[in-house]
Amino acid sequence: MRRLSLWWLLSRVCLLLPPPCALVLAGVPSSSSHPQPCQILKRIGHAVRVGAVHLQPWTTAPRAASRAPDDSRAGAQRDEPEPGTRRSPAPSPGARWLGSTLHGRGPPGSRKPGEGARAEALWPRDALLFAVDNLNRVEGLLPYNLSLEVVMAIEAGLGDLPLLPFSSPSSPWSSDPFSFLQSVCHTVVVQGVSALLAFPQSQGEMMELDLVSLVLHIPVISIVRHEFPRESQNPLHLQLSLENSLSSDADVTVSILTMNNWYNFSLLLCQEDWNITDFLLLTQNNSKFHLGSIINITANLPSTQDLLSFLQIQLESIKNSTPTVVMFGCDMESIRRIFEITTQFGVMPPELRWVLGDSQNVEELRTEGLPLGLIAHGKTTQSVFEHYVQDAMELVARAVATATMIQPELALIPSTMNCMEVETTNLTSGQYLSRFLANTTFRGLSGSIRVKGSTIVSSENNFFIWNLQHDPMGKPMWTRLGSWQGGKIVMDYGIWPEQAQRHKTHFQHPSKLHLRVVTLIEHPFVFTREVDDEGLCPAGQLCLDPMTNDSSTLDSLFSSLHSSNDTVPIKFKKCCYGYCIDLLEKIAEDMNFDFDLYIVGDGKYGAWKNGHWTGLVGDLLRGTAHMAVTSFSINTARSQVIDFTSPFFSTSLGILVRTRDTAAPIGAFMWPLHWTMWLGIFVALHITAVFLTLYEWKSPFGLTPKGRNRSKVFSFSSALNICYALLFGRTVAIKPPKCWTGRFLMNLWAIFCMFCLSTYTANLAAVMVGEKIYEELSGIHDPKLHHPSQGFRFGTVRESSAEDYVRQSFPEMHEYMRRYNVPATPDGVEYLKNDPEKLDAFIMDKALLDYEVSIDADCKLLTVGKPFAIEGYGIGLPPNSPLTANISELISQYKSHGFMDMLHDKWYRVVPCGKRSFAVTETLQMGIKHFSGLFVLLCIGFGLSILTTIGEHIVYRLLLPRIKNKSKLQYWLHTSQRLHRAINTSFIEEKQQHFKTKRVEKRSNVGPRQLTVWNTSNLSHDNRRKYIFSDEEGQNQLGIRIHQDIPLPPRRRELPALRTTNGKADSLNVSRNSVMQELSELEKQIQVIRQELQLAVSRKTELEEYQRTSRTCES
């Protein structure tokens, strides 16, 4: 109300200040554009207005000890406000309606006799405001984004209303009809209302409303406590009664009697003046019914002794002729008292059947002291005052919406806005709208709303029918048998009293139920196997798989199964076992009931499809099954139509993928070490080789020309050879370094290579076997699922809770995955394991997926990602089933006593594939595909070797001649001894030829006594060269030392002095070493000359032989 006042004040200010308000309103976001008719919408202000009159609060009168048929029912009480004060409503912000309990008709005597009840006030104004607020939140109720407004009349003593600031509260209502008409015109009709809602409380006010509707041609809906009799049938004036129609109770009671073929009945009245006219008329119109006695115990109720004596006589007289007794006008206290007295003193004939004819409140129903087989009917929830007000307002809104689609101008623009100019010739908007009011039906808050005849708005409630029976524990319990909808009874699964004889095979004992249980195959909760040759199950429960959900077919199959002549085809028989079957057997044992088990015909859990529920849910709703036991997920949609027990198994949704054993690719042998490690190893190798070379050439003891006058040289290529040999473990001849630093560094490199090689070898086997790759999904929010690309395929089971979750949470994802959904979980697993696979990922309950992973012999399945959509498995039951509470209690006991843990260990104790110990042969048995990379590497090596050979020839023929011509590039000994020889080959050959031609001359010039010694004073490399053996005339190559003949110095020349460790010269040692070295060189020369002499002698012999042979031939 305060919010409406603020908006009215803002509108008035905007009228005074047009320019600023225009700027303010320009910033308000505009609503969506209206297609048509824009001019009409602008004229009516984008609102449909409904007037309201007779808004005085209703005060319910206290009930008398003896009720008339139109008395109101006692419900939840409210304190009546003090005179002159207003009740302050406190609605919940998210509530759809405000609950003010209506006093409807109920069993009399719910209070003590003579005790009054406090009066209660009902406030029509508040109910109207909340009805408008709730209906404006309903999308699509009115077309063109129209809103609903209420225009309330101003009544004396109620104060001014913000919706009508221009009206004066001082205008009192007159008692005569003409003054009332004038007041309605001046305060309500001028606002352009489409209809009027009224709350009359007397016959005179009803006549005033008749006058208003006839004169102004405006539809009026009167909300009354009970129907007022009317002589005229005015189609513009409708009345909606808050009282439950007596005819509804009569119809339900007659339907119950007809359903059970109880045509012979008697009546028992607790109140003499109770109205049973409608019931008697219905039974008299049907020739099958026969009314016996009418037992009126009104006068005998106060005295127990009188009541006992009277009932004993009456009940004995009717037990044979009319065994059915219908009770009217009795509250629960009186009913209990009657049955307690008759049972205590043994005057209750056991063959009597009892029916309560009055509607009962389910919350007031008790079982103590009541006989088994008692039938009652009533509503689970009681309608309240605000429900009827909102339904009346919605009736107007729906009629306007329908009329607008045909003639918008006539439906939206009221014809009567000035009472002085009433349209009488043409069709008015009120007359046009009344046609649609009479043909509008919908399901409202108070019941099914429709117009009966031409003046009555009927709110038909759906009644439930209960029967007092034994529960599985042997205790009395109210069991729902069915419901009364649309004038007929819709049966539930409960057993009607007269139908017990038709279910002899199902009920062998009155206290032991025989239920029909439906299941669905889902491992490990339900397995199936074939029956034996005799059609029996050595282990597990016998179940039928008839491939249908037709109740009559199942009845005939089970009847045949339990008969002596079993004609059920063997193909329909299966043996069911598993987690849920064990649980079902335990529940049946503890609750003492038998059951027949069958597999759901369509193989679905259940979903709303083509206007009905399928699968397990559909079988429960149609009464085909009394219980559904399998991995039945509890979700919101299913819980709204069926009952679930408390969860016996908690799970969530998961994602299943397939792992693929990939053969090691070409570069797999390098996978044990990261590429950064490989790079580091080869960089360290070459750095080590560089430092080895530097240390060796800088050391005085190194294997270099300057070191110890060695015949071999340690170059950079030698260092690389050592480093690679140590890294890869080659056993080849190498030239190790001679200096201490080089050897230390070489050993350090060997340690480094040992650790690298051991790490590589340790990881090589696992890598070469092949890596298991799979689709990496983080969960349901993974981009691969929300934005699938490159043919990524994923799905779930059709009509399962997983599909329902995806459809509600991610509609776009559901639309994509529909093409990949599968009929059942085994199909999805098979699609993953196929080669090639038909699915890349499968979404389903994680409990089912974990089991599939654990039994996968090939270890190809894996669950990935975070679990999502936590849910539980429960046992499904029909709505309002009496078994729900008992089974839930048993499940709680099973959990606390460890039975559920035992079931889990029994059916889930399978070694997970990831924890299996593989055989050694399975791991190390590798084929050529695992080493394909090494073979490729070897082939690449062959190719590179060919390229290297070609490169050598190119270097030898093109590059070396150019290097030889450059004097600065002649020395390559530090890099490669072989390269150095190749570059200096021409120089050595010239020296060798020069030595061969002149050595005889040199030796002939030496005197006989002259000692020829070599000049050893110069220790440089130029005077120490190797002899290169030539390949002349096919002889073997021998290396000799070539040096330049230098004239010997005087024998007394002082040798250069060398410093020893003590600082003195040691010339004796130097000369001694030089002589020994020269002697060894001379011995080598003698050996060479000797070989040449041998060759010369051999040649001479050959020539002489040749000469002798030639002479012989000439002669």
UniProtKB/Swiss-Prot annotation:
Bilayer-crossing regions: 675-694, 742-761, 933-948
Subcellular location: Cell membrane; Postsynaptic cell membrane; Postsynaptic density
Region span, PPP2CB binding site: 951-987
Catalyzed reactions: Ca(2+)(in) = Ca(2+)(out); Na(+)(in) = Na(+)(out)
Record's comment on post-translational modification: N-glycosylated.
Binding-site residues for glycine, renumbered to this chain: S631, S633, R638, S801, D845
GO molecular function list: calcium channel activity; glutamate receptor activity; glycine binding; glycine-gated cation channel activity; identical protein binding; NMDA glutamate receptor activity; protein phosphatase 2A binding; serine binding
UniProt intramembrane annotation: 716-727
Keywords linked to the UniProt accession: Calcium, Cell membrane, Coiled coil, Disulfide bond, Glycoprotein, Ion channel, Ion transport, Ligand-gated ion channel, Magnesium, Membrane, Postsynaptic cell membrane, Receptor, Signal, Synapse, Transmembrane, Transmembrane helix, Transport
Gene3D superfamilies from the UniProt entry: 3.40.50.2300, Periplasmic binding protein-like II
Keyword Hydrolase part of the UniProt annotation: no
Residue ranges, Extracellular side: 24-674, 762-932
Binding of D-serine, residues: S633, R638, S801, A802, D845
Disulfide bond annotation, renumbered to this chain: C537-C575, C543-C576, C859-C913
GO biological process: calcium ion transport; dendrite development; ionotropic glutamate receptor signaling pathway; modulation of chemical synaptic transmission; monoatomic cation transmembrane transport; negative regulation of dendritic spine development; prepulse inhibition; presynaptic modulation of chemical synaptic transmission
Residue segments, region Disordered: 59-118
Domain of life: Eukaryota
Positions of glycan attachment: N145, N264, N275, N285, N296, N426, N439, N549, N565, N886
Membrane topology: Multi-pass membrane protein
Biased composition (Basic and acidic residues): 68-85
Family stated for the protein in its record: Belongs to the glutamate-gated ion channel (TC 1.A.10.1) family. NR3A/GRIN3A subfamily.
Name of the protein in its database record: Glutamate receptor ionotropic, NMDA 3A
Organism of this sequence: Homo sapiens (Human)
Record gene name: GRIN3A
